[in-house]
From Swiss-Prot:
The protein's Enzyme Commission number: 3.1.3.-, 3.1.3.8
PROSITE patterns, sorted: HIS_ACID_PHOSPHAT_1, HIS_ACID_PHOSPHAT_2
Residues listed as glycosylation sites in the UniProt record: N27, N105, N120, N207, N230, N339, N352, N376
Biological source species: Aspergillus terreus
Name listed for the protein in its UniProt record: Phytase A
Lineage, highest ranks first: Eukaryota, Fungi, Dikarya, Ascomycota, Pezizomycotina
């Protein structure tokens, strides 16, 4: 395959809603779109935090998405999260245990709980599901179509972190990209298919800008867990009390409540290859409770990997410095988590490419977005009260790192400008940039954009890792 498998040991979201239960069923033909993402059950699925399937935020963008007529794109970097997956191993065990305890202890399972009588947990763990694979094929097609003046003749240089769901996501992106090209009568018919060019091992023995592992103090941090525990203690007991009243014989902890809520998104994305069937777990909770759940997951990521953790943003500094190198076509300067052996080799880190695609995990995307300063306007999130999306400066896990999340960093040349302009799109939302002078379309001059990444260029507070 020509893939470099590196084995080098070098180091609708927070707003309040009514308290009625939600139980819609979707039309599967309308559930997914290459350009708009997941379109079913938006009043619910947009409140699933990082377990939400990608949906376009174009309508929420403060700047227009279209490229002006007097400009043309000259460079694109896409950074994407893997597609929808089964729960992790530890979560799989926790979810199954909660369900088994209810089945064992409940003396009655009436009405909307009746499905639990014969429910058998069978989602597996860790890996992409068919819906997640389709999401990444759609991303490949979207990337091809959006930048077709380039993609008709140029292949992206593709990297992935070496976990099965991330690597497979990159492969599915390539597949979707090539399928779109083959359906384009204007494409170069002699252009070979792109491939996954570099797969970077994960773990504490490897420097890897697409997966955090080597910052010792960060890996030992409990800041995110503590924040999540604080808010869980605020909202979950009332839900547990309500459920216990409906389920005689059952006693539920706060963690049990969160486990049952998580079953809703995970099962929905696993039941069909387009997620058109809503899990019966979703009907067990009210709209107001889903608003609280969504905030919990956003809080967890903010304090775990974003601006709420003193060592969160620096986990993304290595990738930010790689972006600078690609934008400026100059060697990488970094002393954090960059793999210097890879990045010094033009075969594994070219500087002359036009299109780049990197694939990673949600947590890494959060750190990278903060290292880029995209959410510098987000103030510390309350650990006791739900804050509306307008108060978080556009940050929410469902808006930021849903399944198949994608950020596009575009560079464009415009007739009236001597220097190229840069803008950043997160899930189709053109981001208000910080640290550089932004024009009325959300763009900065490239050199100003790079200069504004002072936190990354200085290496952040990486020295505090050890």
């Amino acid at each position: 395959m020509g893939v470099f498998v590196v084995l080098l040991s070098i180091a609708t979201l927070f707003g309040s809603t009514s308290g009625t239960a939600l139980g819609p069923r979707g039309n599967h033909s309308d559930c997914t779109s290459v350009d708009r993402g997941y379109q079913c059950f938006p009043e619910l699925s947009h409140k699933w935090g990082l377990y939400a399937p990608y949906f376009s935020l174009q309508d929420e963008s403060p700047f227009p998405l279209d490229v002006p007529d007097d400009c043309h794109i000259t460079f694109v970097q896409v950074l994407a999260r893997h597609g929808a997956r089964s729960p992790t191993d530890s979560k799989t065990k926790a979810y199954a245990a909660t369900i088994a305890a209810i089945q064992k202890n409940a003396t009655a399972l009436p009405g909307k709980y009746a499905f639990l009588k014969s429910y058998n947990y069978s989602m597996g763990s860790e890996n992409l599901n068919p819906f997640g694979r389709n999401q990444l094929q759609d991303l490949g097609a979207q990337f091809y179509r959006r930048y077709d003046t380039l993609t008709r003749h140029i292949n992206p240089f593709v990297r992935a972190a070496d976990s099965s769901r991330v690597h497979e996501s990159a492969e599915k992106f390539v597949e979707g990209f090539q399928n779109a090209r083959q359906g384009d009568p204007h494409a170069n018919p002699h252009q070979p298919s792109p491939r996954v060019d570099v797969v970077i091992p994960e773990g504490t023995a490897y420097n890897n800008t697409l997966e955090h592992s080597i910052c010792t103090a960060f890996e030992a941090s409990t800041v995110g867990d503590a924040a999540a525990d604080n808010f869980t203690a605020v909202f979950a007991p009332a839900i547990a009390k309500r459920l216990e009243a409906d389920l005689p014989g059952v006693q539920l902890s706060a963690d049990d409540v969160v486990n049952l809520m998580a079953m809703c998104p995970f099962e929905t994305v696993s039941l069909t290859d387009d997620a058109h069937t809503l899990s019966p777990f979703c009907d067990l909770f009210t709209a107001a409770e889903w608003t609280q759940y969504n905030y919990l997951l956003s809080l967890d990521k903010y304090y775990g990997y974003g601006g709420g953790n003193p060592l969160g943003p620096v986990q993304g500094v290595g990738w930010a410095n790689e972006l600078i190198a690609r934008l400026t076509r100059s060697p990488v300067h970094d002393h954090t988590c960059v793999n210097n052996t890879l990045d010094a080799n033009p075969a594994t880190f070219p500087l002359n490419a036009t299109l780049y695609a990197d694939f990673s995990h949600d947590s890494n995307l959060v750190s990278i977005f903060w290292a880029l300063g995209l959410y510098n306007g987000t103030k510390p999130l309350s650990q006791t009260t739900v804050e509306d999306i307008t108060r978080t400066d556009g940050y929410a896990a469902a808006w930021t790192v849903p399944f198949a999340a994608r950020a596009y960093i575009e560079m464009m040349q415009c007739r009236a400008e001597k220097q190229p302009l840069v803008r950043v799109l997160v899930n189709d939302r053109v981001m208000p940039l910080h640290g550089c002078a932004v024009d009325n379309l959300g763009r900065c001059k490239r050199d100003d954009f790079v200069e504004g990444l002072s936190f990354a260029r200085a290496g952040g507070n990486w020295a505090e890792c050890f």
